[in-house]
Each structure stands twice: as structure tokens, then as C-alpha cells.
């Protein structure tokens, strides 16, 4: 089984890129540090539930969308 942190990070990258956003733009819009988001996207950082909700709101998707495997429609 692939590490859930890696899958989450891949899904986050996918959703961010669909908007044409850089990590910097996502960081600015969500209020999270770019370095933290980079670690999450690489599967190196754990993410708190509160931050999943912040990212979902920022990306305009339900929080559950961030937990789906990469390659899923949103």
C-alpha cells in the first residue's frame, strides 16, 4: 500500500495545478506556509484536519476530495 501522506500530497498537487496555482499562491490564499505545503505535497509532512479544511475551502472543493486517490475527478 502506498503511504497515505504521499497519496494526499499527489492529490493536493493535482488540485492546485488544475487551478494553475503555484505553491506560493496556494500558501498565500490558504494562510499556510509555502515550506509546509511543499512538505505535504512531497509526503514528508503530516497534515492536521484543520489544515485539510483550510485547503479544501481555498481550493473550493469538499474536504473529502482531498482524501480521494490522485487521478479522480473533483
Language model features: what each stretch is:
Residues 10-29:
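Short basic helix-loop element that most often maps to the first helix and adjoining turn
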Residues 12, 26, 37-40, 66:
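Conserved hydrophobic/aromatic packing and binding residues within compact polymer-binding modules
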Residues 31-45:
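Recognition helix of helix-turn-helix/homeodomain-like DNA-binding domains
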Residues 1-7:
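A detector for short, charged/polar N-terminal pre-domain segments
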Residues 48-52:
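Long, hydrophobic alpha-helical segments
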Residues 24, 35, 53:
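Residues within helix-turn-helix
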Residues 57, 65-74:
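Short, charged recognition helix plus adjacent turn
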